[in-house]
Swiss-Prot record:
The lineage of its organism: Bacteria, Pseudomonadati, Pseudomonadota, Gammaproteobacteria, Pasteurellales. HAMAP family: UPF0145. PANTHER family: UPF0145 PROTEIN YBJQ. Belongs to the UPF0145 family. InterPro entries: UPF0145_dom_sf, UPF0145_YbjQ-like. It comes from Pasteurella multocida (strain Pm70). It comes from the Bacteria. This is UPF0145 protein PM1668.
Length: 107
């Protein structure tokens, strides 16, 4: 399945628009990891633990988006966007990744 951030696919013709599809992942992070990630940020390094977790969550969101498109009979998703949101409250720290795009049939 073709997945692209562009509104069209060069060399392909969109013959049917299905609907907007989403892939959503909410992932928690624990206090100890938050603490050490904060220290890493202060000294100017990169937080490998967070980067790895975000990469996995992004992959899951895109896979979910692709599965929704397949269920609709699409063979491509155009206009894909991936958004990241931090969710904090009640002593919990989480982040949400949402991938969205338009499921289409191309030939």
């Amino acid at each position: 399945m073709l997945i692209t951030t562009t509104p069209s696919i060069e060399g392909k013709q969109i013959i049917e628009y299905k609907e907007v599809v989403f892939g959503e992942v909410v992932a928690g992070s624990n206090f100890i990891r938050d603490f050490f990630a904060g220290i890493t940020d202060i000294i100017g390094g990169r937080s490998g633990a967070y980067e790895s977790k975000i990469a996995r969550a992004r992959k899951e969101a895109l896979e979910e988006l692709q599965q929704q498109a397949k269920r609709l009979g699409a063979n491509a998703v155009v206009g894909v966007e991936v958004n990241y949101t931090s969710i904090n409250g009640e002593g919990k720290s989480m982040f949400m990744i949402v991938a969205s795009g338009t499921a289409v049939v191309v030939r």
